[in-house]
């Protein structure tokens, strides 16, 4: 996993030059948004269980066959596995958002996810939809447009770029599942 600082050093080193120009501008932007990034990750992690359970409840309401006998989340064991998987995905998205780099998400979460779900018989359409619901919930929390007020102080300012970055990580998960 490379964070923004490591990426800048590797980029400069590969070209045999000092860190400068574009790398410094990128790092400056990353640092300037640091508190917003921390607030965004805090908002996601503080509300993780609600985000995941709402996503799973959402797919169950949209597709009642999931909770019917032989459905994707029919037994308690399958429901628990679905909730666990949602929390794992959300955790790795928050890691990527904190680092400003998707490699931890790619390496430790997405690599082989589609094949694993296929082998386990997980309905990929429903799993993708659950991730899309988590994406919407996380985006609302990051941009402070959720209906429930946050119970923590937040840095003021526009967080749409960080919300967009988080959305791109969720999109990577959806693409990996589909």
Swiss-Prot record:
Its main location: membrane. (2R,3E)-phycoerythrobilin 2 binds at residue 159. It is a peripheral membrane protein. Transmembrane segments: none annotated. It is found in: Cellular thylakoid membrane. InterPro entries: Globin-like_sf, Phycobilisome_asu/bsu, Phycobilisome_asu/bsu_sf. One of its GO terms (biological process) is photosynthesis. Keywords: Antenna complex, Bile pigment, Chromophore, Electron transport, Membrane, Photosynthesis, Phycobilisome, Thylakoid, Transport. (2R,3E)-phycoerythrobilin 1 binds at residue 82. Light-harvesting photosynthetic bile pigment-protein from the phycobiliprotein complex. Heterodimer of an alpha and a beta chain. This is C-phycoerythrin class 2 subunit beta. It comes from Synechococcus sp. (strain WH8103). The gene is mpeB.
